[in-house]
């Protein structure tokens, strides 16, 4: 049977990334409290393609992924990339995995437990020289505007925001620890279930702890800078403004911080 993908391409244009994108796939990830958590990931997998090959073999990406029996952790991700390079005869391989991650969270006053959803994941890029591994968390939080509080007699505008943390590391860093860092840097964390005493606490806590997105980004960055496991990091904070028809945004990475 004719193998069109392997035929020679005369245009002599190498491609940096070819592969599959937005694959929905069941996975098992490490959970700090419960050891494992089942979830559904969205996965991108790529390899490079030499200038003289017409196309890659898309089915082989799934064949490689299926070998690992749904288990996704830092050790397996390195093995997946090695297998991709070997199977597809590539010089480089990369994978991006994002998934909903759930933690049981107690309301601040009543202590009623409910599940809180976060978006977490891994990114890894493997070339012949080295393998770069990243952990990603996206944490919903709340911010209350310091300026609004200062100039207003009765209240201050507040809103949900999203803190996104990406760290490069060669060691295990728990999602839970990065999530806790983001929440502790906000005006107040978010909760799925709140009774009236909890709602009173959250409202007053935010008012007592006003923060700009710039404040949140800087506080997270300073804490990440102290973590010796982290080689590089990037922090993004986006606030979904309640009184504006636009969002507020702040970003910092370790390259731009003073040593």
UniProtKB/Swiss-Prot annotation:
Keywords: Hydrolase. Its EC number is 3.5.4.16. It catalyses: GTP + H2O = 7,8-dihydroneopterin 3'-triphosphate + formate + H(+). It holds the Pfam family GCHY-1. The record marks 145 as: May be catalytically important. InterPro entries: GTP_cyclohydrolase_FolE2, GTP_cyclohydrolase_FolE2/MptA. It is an enzyme of class 3 (hydrolase). Coiled coil: none annotated. GO terms for molecular function: GTP cyclohydrolase I activity. Pathway: Cofactor biosynthesis; 7,8-dihydroneopterin triphosphate biosynthesis; 7,8-dihydroneopterin triphosphate from GTP: step 1/1. One of its GO terms (biological process) is tetrahydrofolate biosynthetic process. Belongs to the GTP cyclohydrolase IV family. PANTHER family: GTP CYCLOHYDROLASE MPTA. Converts GTP to 7,8-dihydroneopterin triphosphate. This is GTP cyclohydrolase FolE2. It comes from Thermosipho africanus (strain TCF52B).
